[in-house]
Curated annotation (Swiss-Prot):
A GO cellular component entry from the record: exocyst
Compositionally biased residues, Polar residues: 23-46, 486-502, 1062-1071
Ranges of compositional bias, category Low complexity: 52-62
Positions with biased composition (Basic and acidic residues): 110-126, 999-1010
The species this protein was found in: Arabidopsis thaliana
Top-rank lineage group of the source organism: Eukaryota
Transmembrane segments: none
Gene designation: SEC5B
Full protein name: Exocyst complex component SEC5B
Keywords tagged on the record: Exocytosis, Phosphoprotein, Transport
Organism placement in taxonomy: Eukaryota, Viridiplantae, Streptophyta, Embryophyta, Tracheophyta
Chain intervals with Acidic residues compositional bias: 1-12
Biological processes per GO annotation: acceptance of pollen; exocytosis; Golgi to plasma membrane transport
Region annotation (Disordered) ranges: 1-126, 486-511, 984-1013, 1055-1090
Record flagged with keyword rRNA-binding: no
Homology family: Belongs to the SEC5 family.
Length: 1090
């Protein structure tokens, strides 16, 4: 067919399609077979139906040739798989005379010829030979054909087949040959059975099922048919005789060789028997060939030129006469061709509208089935219109695929719909894996949601900043209005351009709101991954465990194994590890956002629940991921790592906050003592500073302890967390100890600053300063303003931390970090704390005792030098002087001050001060040996010894061993100075000039005694004065000394008191000193200790 014919045919097809679109798209079957003239399928495959062994009757033959309704439907389906070629149909009609018994010739002629043929058939039949097909006895004809075939078959075939039927597993015998219409080609050339012409396999017991399922293409058939030029013996043996034994194959080969040999002999015998015929035929052929050569040599033979010209003239006239008829005939042939093509491919032309209708109705399976039917049609290569129809179908299906892909992007799609969508896409053979497309879409959607959370958070933070700025601007304007009255200056507009100072309360409120927004942001991020990632992972598990793979398998028996392998490879091109990588990437994005936001939390509000609530949210996410089939193990470990990291940051911030808060409260000492109930009946009169420090440590350590317990629970489930937790525990322990050391250092600094200020005040008298009124106006009314009492308060704070607070808090929180530490290390930490506070206490105590020692030195100086007495000409002893009582009052004031401020340190402080007092007496005696204390007479010696015995008796509870030794040295120095003074007086008055006594003889020492005095006499005289006056003086001053001697009774001089005093006198340092001194030896004073 030429190109112009193709164009005309396309135009006719377009016109037919236009008419077809106006009809009903649903095809209705005609009511009867005679109402239409279907196009006969001339290339139909043989029907697979069993025929009876007996010859069929005439009526049966006719009935078998009549098409049924089912066969008509099958023919219509088979019509869709053949091509349209007029030339092939013409050739088929030409060859149809043998197969259809003249039916093809009847269809090829015109109506008049068919009518004439029917009239001739109705004529009388002579009964000898049938002159038309209807008079042919088809049964007899079939019998004759069968006999001819059997007569042409080698006689040994039947015998060999009959001989091999003895076993139960042998091939089908030759007697079943009559059910095959083709004859010799169905017999195995090896004479081992019969070959099925459809499947080209040897007929066995299971050949019935194989013939229905297996189809052989033409290329394979050409190689298996042994009469073909492309016959392949190896393929023939491997396919047809794949289950034949070797022995049978050998016997078959022998039979084949013998048959070939027999046929060669028969052919030679045939030539020999008909040699005359062969010679005659050869002569005839040579004659014909010579005549043809003569005709070719002389084409203008006798009369041929004239005949040729006449025929040419007739042909030209006929062409001019019948040209319109020929054109119409050609057009009619084209119309019939187009009509046949439309009839054949009517389903194809209706496919676009059918598929669109099915898709619009939601009948997706029907649309896919119709599309697959269209794909299976074998179209002629020269018909462009059919290709355009298929392109339209492809366009519709591409739109349908896009719709299915978009449906998978719906976040609310349920699992059933997803599975159905994936199944449809797999049946449509998409370019990419739809399951992987869905997983990628979901992964990008989760990332998009995380980014949207970040965008919303930044927007909320910006709104908050604008609100704070507007509030600050409004406050600034209001302050300007209050300052300038109702008049508004031009500075209001410039105020908006410049940076507005934000008030501290407003700034703190804004920081709290920012932390709240950060906590909300992390909570939303966590909710996104908790809600979506487990579902995403479960979907991936269902995909890679085969749930979608099963739905993607199409039950098409005609699909080749190569296509199945290709589909399997395409489906398995991705692994579950790639999905786990997607989830890990999502967790990494989440981790970066959480850690960045967690670092932005304000440390000032660390005790607020923002940071701890964030850690709890991450812990909930870990628990959700640890559920069955909720997330891959790597994602769980990554999320646990996020939790450990932010917990570590939180704990580090808590530790730094405790140290920073300790430093901050140390700068704000209020010097207000707490009540005994607030300090839990502690003997230390502490300020609020240790309690504030305790509150800071408890608040921080409680949060840390809660976080550590959570981390230990994580470590129990994962060994990888032990190293991180061990590092955190070490940092917590060091931070706890450093907080105490920092607090001790701050207390030491406060004490040093306070001592430095006290040394600059020269106007202090008995521990009071003249400028206290200024400090009272600054501090609270109940606060301590005296520097010495403040030093005592620092000492109490140190003692409270050392004796109570450190051990209490350490024993309470040591189990937080005691995961792998030994008990001796635990004890060493606490001992180090005690030693630190002890050393600090010694330093502050030195500041206090130094300040008090200055006061005591002043009082001692007033007592010994400025009391208005001349020790070289002292009056007689009448009792304890007022100067001694004033000196004792200084110690009483210190006792009261220490008892109220640091009672546990009372013995230590007074022991130090008493020892310092005695050393002060020694230093004053040594310093003024040549001045005010250049001489001491007997009365002065007795007075000093009485008062020293008085001091010793009262201060005995606070006399240390060193103080006792110092007192002995002091008494010896006084005795030595008295003896020296008396000796010098005697030497200066050799004439025996005697001073008249001004008082009674009992009160004065005679000149004879003074001139011949000895150390024992002086000690005896002093002991006499002491025994007569000491107890009386103790009674007089018992109220003054009650704080030192609490055992002194109120009754006047009871026997018990006397006995106590006698014991005291006996054990006094003066008596010991006297007993230890040799008679007449000079007294050497012990050097000063300080």
């Amino acid at each position: 067919m030429s190109s112009s014919d193709d164009l005309d045919e396309d135009e006719l097809l377009q016109m037919a399609l236009k008419e077809q679109s106006q009809r009903d798209v649903t095809y209705q079957k005609p009511p009867s077979a005679n109402s239409r003239k279907p196009v006969t399928n001339l290339v139909q495959q043989p029907r697979r139906q069993k025929r009876a062994a007996a010859p069929p009757s005439k009526g049966g033959a006719k009935a078998s040739r009549k098409p049924s309704m089912d066969e008509d439907d099958e023919s219509e389906v088979e019509l869709l798989s053949i091509s349209s070629g007029d030339e092939d149909e013409g050739n088929d009609r030409g060859r149809g005379g043998g197969g259809d018994g003249g039916g093809g010739r009847g269809r090829g002629g015109s109506g008049k010829e068919r009518g004439r043929a029917r009239k001739e058939d109705d004529r009388a039949w002579d009964g000898v030979e049938p002159d038309c097909w209807k008079r042919v006895n088809e049964a007899e004809l079939a019998r004759k054909v069968r006999d001819m075939r059997e007569s042409r078959t080698a006689p040994s075939v039947t015998q060999n087949l009959d001989r091999k039927v003895s076993g139960a597993d042998k091939k089908v015998v030759l007697t079943s040959l009559q059910s095959f219409p083709r004859g010799m080609e169905c017999i195995d050339p090896l004479k081992l059975g019969i070959i099925d012409n459809k499947t080209l396999r040897l007929i066995t017991e299971s050949s019935e099922s194989l013939s229905k399922a297996e189809k052989v293409d033409n290329a394979l058939r050409e190689k298996l048919v042994y009469t073909s030029d492309h016959f392949d013996p190896k393929l023939f043996i491997s396919r047809i005789h794949q289950e034949t034994s070797a022995a049978d194959l050998e016997s078959g080969a022998l039979a084949l060789k013998s048959d070939l040999k027999g046929r060669n002999l028969q052919r030679k015998q045939l030539v020999k028997d008909n040699f005359d015929c062969f010679v005659s035929c050869k002569t005839t052929i040579d004659d014909i060939e010579s005549k043809l050569k003569r005709i070719e040599d002389d084409p203008d033979g006798s009369g041929t030129t004239h005949l040729f010209n006449c025929m040419k003239s007739v042909t030209s006239r006929a062409n001019r006469a019948f040209e319109p008829l020929f054109e119409r005939q050609a057009q009619a042939e084209k119309i019939r061709s187009v009509q046949g093509m439309l009839q054949r491919f009517r389903t194809l032309f209706n496919l676009p509208s059918i598929i669109r209708s099915s898709i619009s109705k939601g009948e997706y399976d029907l649309a896919v089935r119709e599309y697959k039917k269209a794909k299976s049609i074998a179209l002629p290569s020269h018909v462009n219109l059919l290709k355009r129809v298929l392109e339209e179908v492809e366009k519709v299906m591409q739109e349908f695929k896009g719709t299915l892909y978009r449906s998978m992007e719906d976040p609310k799609i349920d699992f059933t719909s997803l599975e159905n969508t994936v199944r449809l896409l797999l049946e449509l053979e998409p370019e990419s894996d739809p399951v992987w497309h869905y997983l990628n879409v979901q992964n990008h959607r989760i990332h998009g949601m995380l980014e949207k959370c970040t965008f919303d958070h930044e927007a909320r933070m910006e709104i908050l900043r604008n609100q704070v700025h507007e509030r600050a601007l409004s406050d600034a304007k209001w302050r300007q209005i209050q300052q300038n009255g109702v008049q508004l200056s031009d500075d209001t507009s410039s105020m908006e351009d410049n940076q507005v100072q934000v008030d501290q309360p407003l700034e703190e409120s804004a920081r709290r709101e920012k932390d709240a927004l950060r906590g909300r942001y992390i909570k939303i991020l966590t909710a996104v991954i908790v809600y979506h990632l487990p579902t995403f992972w479960k979907t991936a598990l269902s995909v890679f465990t085969g749930k979608f793979a099963k739905s993607s398998q199409v039950n098409d028996t005609s699909a080749s194994k190569a296509e199945e392998k290709a589909e399997e490879a395409r489906y398995s091109s991705h692994s579950l590890e790639e999905i786990a990588g997607m989830i890990r990437n999502t967790i990494s994005v989440y981790e970066a956002k959480v850690q960045s936001t967690f670092h932005d939390f304000d440390e000032s509000y660390i005790l607020h629940p923002y940071m701890s609530d964030t850690i709890k949210e991450v812990s909930k996410a870990c628990q959700a991921f640890e559920a069955k089939e909720s997330a891959p193990h790597s994602a769980v470990m990554a999320l646990r790592k996020v939790k450990v990291e932010i917990t570590k940051i939180y704990i580090q911030r808590l530790c730094s906050w405790m140290r920073a808060s300790t430093e901050e409260i140390s700068k704000e000492e209020t010097w207000i003592p707490v009540s005994i109930l607030e300090r839990n009946r502690s003997p230390y009169s502490i300020s609020y500073l240790p309690l504030a420090f305790r509150s800071i440590i408890v608040s921080g350590m409680e949060q840390i302890n809660m976080m550590i317990l959570s981390l230990k629970g994580e470590a129990a489930r994962s060994e990888d967390m032990f190293a991180h937790i061990e590092e955190i525990l070490i940092s917590v322990r060091l931070a706890f100890l450093n907080c105490f050391l920092d607090f001790a250092a701050h207390l030491e600094q406060i004490g040093a600053d306070l001592s430095q200020r006290t040394t600059k005040r020269e106007s202090w008298q008995n521990g009071y300063s003249n400028d206290h009124q200024e400090e009272q106006s600054i501090n609270a009314p109940e606060s301590v303003v005296d520097p010495h009492r403040q030093l005592l308060m620092i000492l109490s704070n140190i003692g409270y931390c050392k004796d109570e607070l450190a051990s209490e808090l350490y024993n309470k929180y040591k189990y937080t970090w005691l995961q792998s530490r030994r008990n001796d290390e635990d004890i060493s930490d606490l001992q180090d704390l005690m030693m630190s506070f002890s050393g600090l206490g010694e330093k502050v105590l030195e500041h206090y005792t130094f300040a008090k020692a200055n006061l005591i030195r002043t009082a001692a100086t007033n007592y010994l030098l400025d009391s208005g007495i001349q020790w070289g000409a002292a009056p007689p002893v009448k009792g304890i002087r007022d100067a001694a009582v004033e000196l004792l009052h200084t110690l009483v004031a210190v006792h009261a001050e220490v008892f109220a401020g640091a009672k546990p340190l009372l013995d230590k402080i007074l022991g130090t001060l008493v020892e310092g007092l005695i050393d002060t007496f020694l230093s004053l005696l040594d310093e003024n040996r040549s001045d005010d204390l250049s001489s001491i007479d007997a009365n002065g010696f007795c007075q000093l010894m009485l008062e020293l015995e008085y001091f010793e008796t009262i201060l005995k509870p606070y006399l240390t061993v060193d103080a006792t030794e110092s007192l002995k040295s002091l008494q010896g120095a006084v005795l030595e100075k008295a003896i020296e003074s008396i000796s010098e007086t005697v030497e200066n008055n050799p004439g025996g000039h005697q001073r008249k006594p001004t008082r009674g003889s009992e009160d004065a020492i005679s000149d004879d005694k003074q001139s011949s005095v000895s150390p024992d006499d002086l000690l005896a005289l002093a002991q006499q004065c002491t025994s007569g006056m000491l107890q009386l003086e103790l009674e007089k001053t018992r109220l003054n000394s009650a704080c030192f001697i609490e055992t002194i009774p109120l009754d006047p001089v009871p026997p018990v008191a006397k006995a106590a005093y006698s014991r005291t006198s006996t054990d006094s340092p003066s008596r010991n000193y006297r007993e230890s001194q040799p008679m007449g030896s000079p007294v050497q004073a012990r050097p000063r200790r300080r």
